[in-house]
Amino acid sequence: MAMKKLLIASLLFGSATAYGADGFVVQDIHFEGLQRVAVGAALLNMPVRVGDTVSDEDIGRTIHALFATGNFEDVRVLRDSNTLIVQVKERPTIASITFSGNKSVKDDMLKQNLEASHVRIGEALDRTMLSNIERGLEDFYYSVGKYNASVKAVVTPLPRNRVDLKLVFAEGVSAKIQQINIVGNKSFSSDELLNRFQLRDDVPWWNLTADQKYQKQKLTGDLEALRSFYLDRGYARFNIDSTQVSLTPDKKGIYVTINITEGDQYKISGIDLNGNMAGYQSEITKLAAIEPGSLYNGTQVTKMENDIKNLLGRYGYAYPRVMTQPEINDQGKTVKLHVNIDAGNRFYVRKIRFSGNDTTKDSVLRREMRQMERAWLGSDLIELGKERLNRLGYFETVDVETQRVPGSPDQVDVVYKVKERNTGSLNFGVGFGTESGVSFQIGAQQDNWLGTGNSVGVNASKNDYSTYAELSFTDPYFTVNGVSLGGRVFYNDFRADDAELSGYTNQSYGIDGFLGFPINENNSLRFGLNYVHNSLSDMLPQAAMWRYLNSMGEKPDYKSKAEFKADDFALNVGWTYNNLDRGFFPTSGVKSTLNGKVTIPGSDNEFYKVTFDTSAYYPINDDRTWVILGRSRLGYGDGLGGKELPFYENFYAGGSSTVRGFRSNNIGPKAIYMNGKDDPKKDSPSRDAVGGNAMAVASLELITPTPFLDSKYSNSVRTSFFIDSGTVWDTYWNDSAAMKGSGIPDYGKPGNIRVSAGIALQWVSPLGPLVFSYAKPIKDYEGDRSEQFQFNIGKTW
């Protein structure tokens, strides 16, 4: 039977011919070439059905419709009598997608890019999309300065009409900026202007933020910084006329020319406030206090706008609009600011919702909120809630947004989105020094037990000099008003001689508890009681120990080891101020604690101790990746009623939490072992640390972006350069002529300050916080022991 060709068409690969006959009635439709696509699915996409009278136009629409499905590379429609024969060539199915040579672009990002273009495993391959993807990726590389980059899509046929898709990258090298020229600057030198650029044609080794590799995005940011520089200095007519970026023939060098018009400096002639200010005109007027006669300042204007928005936001106006229109008088060189304000609607908060807290219970987050549901929205209260969630330390990131309630003109929902971090830690520490070798400790802590916000700790350690066990518990919301309750029980068998401290053994155990009372958002008080039993033995005849025992009415024999037991009850009082922006890796704010301890009647000892700790963070750039950290710790203790502070209550310094680069607890007075009762010249100085009843430690730290690390990890990794200093002294020390004659240092002198400098890396790992530091002593004294590299898990600051 002869087959008549009605139409052969392929929109992409073939041609079309018209069949001049009149239309005919379709009695059957037959497909050839279908493999993956079902007949029923193909029929559903055709505008022609059995029984229809079709024409050439209908056949053309059929071909268009089948191509539009994206399933076919070629479509041909034939007629055999009254039967339509549809011959198709299906597009191959993507069996796998791989990447090769991509270093600057991660696989996940590439997969997202392909997904957006509907290129994924199991889908039909549209070859026309591949060229668009190649061009798009190459354009990305050009935008980051890699003009030699090329991207090729390699398609490998497989059986059953399947293909492997491989994107092959040749990234090349980034073009380096050879020169940046600014043309038109008269009031400021090019060097002064270029110092504000991230892109530089000459990068000093010490400048970690500048970059000689061209990136279009960074150039855009630099141009904005240049514009802000002039606008902040009164140049209201400043303009960037043009920017030329020229490429060297080998595509490895870039020349940038920026043409500017500075204009003249303009002064503020006045401010005019207009619009709907929702009754807060007097308060807004105070915020718009830019002095007439002062130079026009773009940043100051932006700050004024934001301050007005924040003010209105505090009173429930969630979406105020504030726009400043400068009226420039070129003749008088003045600018009048017309500030147009529209407060908009006042909003209630319908609901406060949380997302991302898979472990932490909603109630734990909700109790940190200061914005109430069914109350007027307060933008300051919403931000305070975000700040309080950050301070908990349970979350890596906290974001908040207000969402309008559909169909309601005056209601919003507040949604806090959190990303939880591991709040449990395996506390384990290792230190290594040229003299100390390796030290080790282990424990466990969970700061968000079962998502309740309660803290539970179980710590146990055993090493050459100590066997220690502790169980602790804290409920930060023992009452709904935020009163906290906590306590611990502990046991410690400590052999000081094995720890290179003054020789004695102390078996102690005890229990303590406390209640914490919030005063306001940043201040809290803590009151507690504790009981400790100390059983001292194997005490060698050492000056500080014997002096303490004498004050307790004991008369130990110089020729034998002494023993002593004491049961003490103490009252603990503490104050904390905390306005840090977050619990882990703060970038701004201050945290200070003042703690006092005094024994109460019924105790064998009579003494008090006071410590003051403070940490202050000061960001030095807008995105808070560069931060200055200042830390200090002061401590003092003394006896009461003629008794001395027990030597085992002394302060110590040295190690990862005080003065890095020195052996733990090694800074300060050393043991003087007495060989003769009345002749100090026969006493023996040693290198064993005994601590002192007074201490001062200070540290200055520069926190920087971690080199070679993606910025998205900045909430879990932190690098810093530091200088530590500290001293420990003994105010009971008698620096007699006999002591000097025997070559014993003056341990009562607070000026024996140790100093070290180094670098630290902190990482909040799945195991818990890891801290690495390398430091070298700059100032040390005879008898000090160094420990350059220190490594701990379970401690951050």
UniProtKB/Swiss-Prot annotation:
<dbReference type="InterPro" id="IPR000184">
    <property type="entry name" value="Bac_surfAg_D15"/>
</dbReference>
<dbReference type="InterPro" id="IPR034746">
    <property type="entry name" value="POTRA"/>
</dbReference>
<dbReference type="InterPro" id="IPR023707">
    <property type="entry name" value="OM_assembly_BamA"/>
</dbReference>
<feature type="domain" description="POTRA 2">
    <location>
        <begin position="92"/>
        <end position="172"/>
    </location>
</feature>
<dbReference type="InterPro" id="IPR039910">
    <property type="entry name" value="D15-like"/>
</dbReference>
<feature type="domain" description="POTRA 5">
    <location>
        <begin position="347"/>
        <end position="421"/>
    </location>
</feature>
<comment type="function">
    <text>Part of the outer membrane protein assembly complex, which is involved in assembly and insertion of beta-barrel proteins into the outer membrane. Constitutes, with BamD, the core component of the assembly machinery.</text>
</comment>
<feature type="domain" description="POTRA 4">
    <location>
        <begin position="266"/>
        <end position="344"/>
    </location>
</feature>
<keyword id="KW-0812">Transmembrane</keyword>
<keyword id="KW-0732">Signal</keyword>
<keyword id="KW-0998">Cell outer membrane</keyword>
<dbReference type="GO" id="GO:1990063">
    <property type="term" value="C:Bam protein complex"/>
</dbReference>
<comment type="subunit">
    <text>Part of the Bam complex, which is composed of the outer membrane protein BamA, and four lipoproteins BamB, BamC, BamD and BamE.</text>
</comment>
<feature type="domain" description="POTRA 3">
    <location>
        <begin position="175"/>
        <end position="263"/>
    </location>
</feature>
<feature type="domain" description="POTRA 1">
    <location>
        <begin position="24"/>
        <end position="91"/>
    </location>
</feature>
<keyword id="KW-0677">Repeat</keyword>
<keyword id="KW-0472">Membrane</keyword>
<dbReference type="Pfam" id="PF07244">
    <property type="entry name" value="POTRA"/>
</dbReference>
<dbReference type="GO" id="GO:0043165">
    <property type="term" value="P:Gram-negative-bacterium-type cell outer membrane assembly"/>
</dbReference>
<feature type="signal peptide">
    <location>
        <begin position="1"/>
        <end position="20"/>
    </location>
</feature>
<dbReference type="Pfam" id="PF01103">
    <property type="entry name" value="Omp85"/>
</dbReference>
<comment type="similarity">
    <text>Belongs to the BamA family.</text>
</comment>
<dbReference type="InterPro" id="IPR010827">
    <property type="entry name" value="BamA/TamA_POTRA"/>
</dbReference>
<protein>
    <recommendedName>
        <fullName>Outer membrane protein assembly factor BamA</fullName>
    </recommendedName>
</protein>
<keyword id="KW-1134">Transmembrane beta strand</keyword>
<dbReference type="GO" id="GO:0051205">
    <property type="term" value="P:protein insertion into membrane"/>
</dbReference>
